[in-house]
Amino acid sequence: MTTTTTMQPFEYNANPARVIFGPGTLKQLPAELARLHVSAPLLLSTPQQLAQAEALQSLLLSSSSSSSSSEKPITPAGIFAEATMHTPTSVTERALEVVRTSRADAVVSVGGGSTIGLGKALAVRTGLPHVCVPTTYAGSEMTPILGETSEEDGGKKTKMTRSDPKILPGTVIYDVELTMTLPAGLSATSGVNAIAHAGMLLFEEREREKSIFRTPVSPC
């Protein structure tokens, strides 16, 4: 007797290949970039978090001066501190020009969803490695989703969202000390955002399980 088994196809995309978590883990950024054979990363931030990007730049420069002669020094290609909410494509285009002229070989985003979104937009367009250093609880660094805003003639803005495994950052460094200086209001809103992401993921997992197992499998 021949039986027919209907299987529900699905796709699964893994989270970032590498996650580093703990207090003081930001100090591991130079080693992570060296592991990726990066020597000229472009640092991304919002205007409000320029000081944090400058601190990263100092960290990388000091690590290069203390590295052995056999190691390739890491010299940041520069800082692009124009990241803003909803990832406007006009900002992305300006950042792309900086990537090209500076010959950056990676992007490092430090901040929340706005900066990480810009890093995603650059990485998916260029294929460059993207290392995230989150400073909020938004969770954008753990999703392969990119939301962008384009402005058409007449000032009309259009929000576009897409999903692609190439959008997912390759390395995420969670230094819990970076969240300690967040204002209480921002901590609360980004925390709620993280809970919302977790709830959506839980619902998605349950729906995936139901789609896989709702059809009985007949023995051959």
Per-range role (PLM):
Residues 2-105:
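ATP/NTP phosphate-donor binding region
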Residues 29, 51, 117-118, 182:
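Glycine/Thr-rich phosphate-binding loops of Rossmann-like dinucleotide-binding domains
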Residues 17, 27, 124-219:
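A glycine/threonine-rich phosphate-anchoring loop and its flanking beta-alpha core
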Residues 53-55, 118-120, 141-143:
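Short glycine-/acidic-enriched loop or helix-start segments at secondary-structure transitions
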Residues 98-122, 126-137:
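A short, small-residue-rich loop immediately preceding and capping a beta-strand
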Residues 24-26, 113-115, 141:
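Gly/Ser/Thr-rich beta-alpha loop segments that engage phosphate groups in nucleotides
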